[in-house]
């Protein structure tokens, strides 16, 4: 019987003479070997607390295979190695870098981001070939002055550290193109940054800066400057000289006014939201010919200047959460504007349905109301005003007719539209007619002359008691405003207006909901508040699949039929000011979704 247990391993009789087994290296030898050939070594996310000496000495020490392979004809030519040019030590647990880093003078890229490094070694100055240095997401409080010797450095990433200042010597990095010091503790910036004339991208966001040095204006090649989330109260006038600037971020500061930027003709984006800016004048807008994005949200603007129309290239304008009570009509003339944000402003004088329809409908609305100095026609000059004809009645806005395709004769207190007004249109292709705020008792007969082109008619604030058949012949009409008249009914011939999308009938004398509206399936908006309507037919409203806004406020509705809750297309339903008991005011206050849900719950099953 063997003296060893079955299955057991016999002891090594030479074990006492063998050298102890070496601990497995933190960096596999295969990686080091491959790096000697490629010149690149990636040791990211390996849990390293120190960098192995073999990494620093990769191009100094003779590799182990040199002692094993003396065959000069072999394919593995260990003596033909490449200097290490790229070293990645990111996402480890490093706290310090050895001075032995000087043994890697050929490094072009050094990435040590996402560690716990508190300082850089003085030997960093030996890396004179370094072009990109990423030391972001560490715990560095101070940069060594030796950094100035990195004369080939193009990218320096220092974001998310604990820096309280930048050394004056940073100005010696003469060919630096990218500098990111965001998310640090900087309270000021050295004037020496003005020497970084090759800088293209400069990120100063999320610090504690109260001012920028005047010298920053010397950065003539800078394209992007980000100063978001600081404590800036003003911007130096020298910024206006940064003629290559394309993007300027000044969000979340304490600015009360904007600097004048007369020479920033290449500026494409200006972000100044979340400040305390109260005024915006023409001097801020002129010469910004390339601007495509202007962000002014969360400020205190009360007036938007008419000179906003100078920004012909503007594509996105964010004015949300300001104190704007009105908008300049010239805003409608911006040819490239695709997004206009206005939420949170106390806007008056613009219909809610227009605001709800989005940017393009709002711009169209504003464009149709551009006021241009009136020009008298020859017929007007030869006419003589009488006691029955107000002098203002002989004035025609010919500029609006020719350029805006708008025929406008409003606020004249006229009982008739002068023939000269219609004659002035000539062969122009009129799309908008505005005869509001007069004393008209009927729809002008000659309006039918524009039936092939007109799509928007405003006859609000008159004394019209009925809609003529002439108006029903405007088959291209998409919007009609008849508010504040004395209408009691609508003609059945309106059924032929198959392009009609919006109708405003508020403040008239309707006692019944006009049946003809049920038969116009294209309607999206019906505003018929402040009348005397006593009932509605939900079965007909359900068939109007495009109806999204229905305003029935201040009528005589004694009950709201539960079936109205099945109008799935409704996005805005206004019922306040009626004598019905249900839904209760508390439910109405919750909005359209809650009201429709309540009504559906009342449908008998």
From Swiss-Prot:
Record's protein name: Leucine-rich repeat-containing protein 40
Protein's organism: Xenopus tropicalis
Superkingdom, taxonomy of origin: Eukaryota
SUPFAM superfamilies: L domain-like
Keyword tags: Leucine-rich repeat, Repeat
LRR repeats: 83-104, 106-127, 129-151, 152-173, 175-196, 198-219, 221-242, 244-265, 266-287, 290-311, 313-335, 336-357, 429-450, 453-475, 476-497, 499-520, 522-543, 546-567, 569-590
Region of interest: Disordered: 1-26
Pfam families: LRR_8
């Amino acid at each position: 019987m063997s003296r060893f247990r079955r299955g057991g391993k016999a002891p090594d009789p030479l074990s006492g003479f063998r050298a102890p087994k070496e601990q497995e290296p933190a960096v596999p030898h295969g990686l080091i070997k491959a790096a000697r050939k490629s010149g690149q070594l990636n040791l990211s996310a390996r849990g390293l607390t120190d960098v192995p000496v073999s990494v620093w000495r990769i191009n100094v020490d003779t590799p182990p295979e040199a002692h094993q392979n003396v065959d000069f004809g072999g394919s593995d030519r260990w003596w033909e190695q490449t200097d290490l040019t790229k070293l990645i030590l990111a996402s480890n647990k490093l706290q310090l870098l050895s001075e032995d880093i000087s043994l890697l003078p050929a490094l072009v890229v050094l990435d040590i981001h996402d560690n716990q490094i508190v300082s850089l070694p003085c030997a960093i100055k030996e890396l004179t070939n370094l072009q990109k240095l990423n030391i972001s997401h560490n715990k560095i409080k101070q940069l060594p002055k030796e950094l100035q010797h990195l004369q080939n450095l193009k990218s320096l990433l220092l974001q998310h550290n604990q820096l309280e200042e930048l050394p004056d010597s940073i100005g010696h990095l003469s060919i630096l193109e990218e500098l990111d010091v965001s998310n640090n503790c900087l309270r000021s910036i050295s004037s020496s940054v003005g020497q970084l004339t090759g800088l293209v991208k400069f990120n100063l966001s999320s610090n504690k800066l109260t001012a920028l040095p005047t010298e920053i204006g010397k950065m003539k090649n800078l394209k992007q400057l980000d100063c978001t989330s600081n404590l800036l109260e003003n911007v130096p006038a020298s910024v206006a000289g940064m003629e290559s600037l394309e993007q300027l971020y000044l969000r979340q500061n304490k600015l009360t006014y904007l600097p004048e930027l007369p020479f920033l003709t290449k500026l494409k984006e200006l972000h100044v939201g979340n400040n305390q800016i109260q005024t915006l004048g023409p001097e801020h807008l002129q010469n910004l010919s390339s601007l495509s994005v202007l962000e002014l949200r969360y400020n205190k603007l009360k007036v938007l200047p008419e000179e906003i129309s100078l920004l012909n290239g503007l594509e996105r304008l964010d004015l949300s959460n300001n104190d704007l009570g009105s908008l300049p009509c010239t805003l409608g003339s911006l040819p490239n504007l695709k997004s206009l944000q206005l939420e949170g402003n106390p806007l008056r004088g613009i219909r809610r349905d227009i605001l709800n329809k989005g940017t393009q409908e709002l711009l169209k609305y504003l464009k149709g109301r551009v006021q241009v100095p009136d020009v008298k026609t020859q017929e007007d000059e030869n006419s003589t005003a009488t006691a029955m004809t107000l002098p203002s009645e002989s004035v025609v806005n010919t500029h609006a007719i020719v350029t805006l395709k708008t025929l406008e004769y409003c606020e004249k207190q006229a009982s008739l539209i002068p023939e000269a007004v219609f004659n002035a249109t000539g062969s122009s292709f009129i799309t908008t007619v505005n005869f509001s705020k007069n004393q008209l008792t009927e729809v002008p007969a000659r309006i039918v002359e524009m039936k092939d082109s007109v799509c928007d008619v405003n006859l609000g604030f008159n004394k019209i008691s009925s809609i003529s058949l002439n108006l029903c012949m405007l088959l291209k009409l998409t919007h009609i405003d008849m508010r504040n008249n004395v209408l009691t009914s609508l003609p059945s011939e309106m059924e032929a207006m198959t392009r009609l999308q919006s109708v405003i009938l508020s403040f008239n004398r309707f006692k019944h909901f006009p049946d003809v509206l049920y038969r116009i399936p294209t309607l999206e908006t019906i505003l018929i508040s402040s009348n005397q309507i006593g009932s509605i037919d939900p079965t007909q409203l359900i068939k109007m699949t495009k109806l999204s806004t229905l305003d029935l406020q201040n009528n005589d509705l004694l009950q709201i039929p539960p079936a109205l809750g099945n109008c799935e297309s409704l996005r805005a339903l206004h019922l306040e000011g009626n004598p019905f008991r249900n839904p209760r005011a508390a439910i109405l206050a919750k909005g359209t979704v809650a009201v429709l849900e309540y009504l559906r719950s009342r449908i008998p099953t």
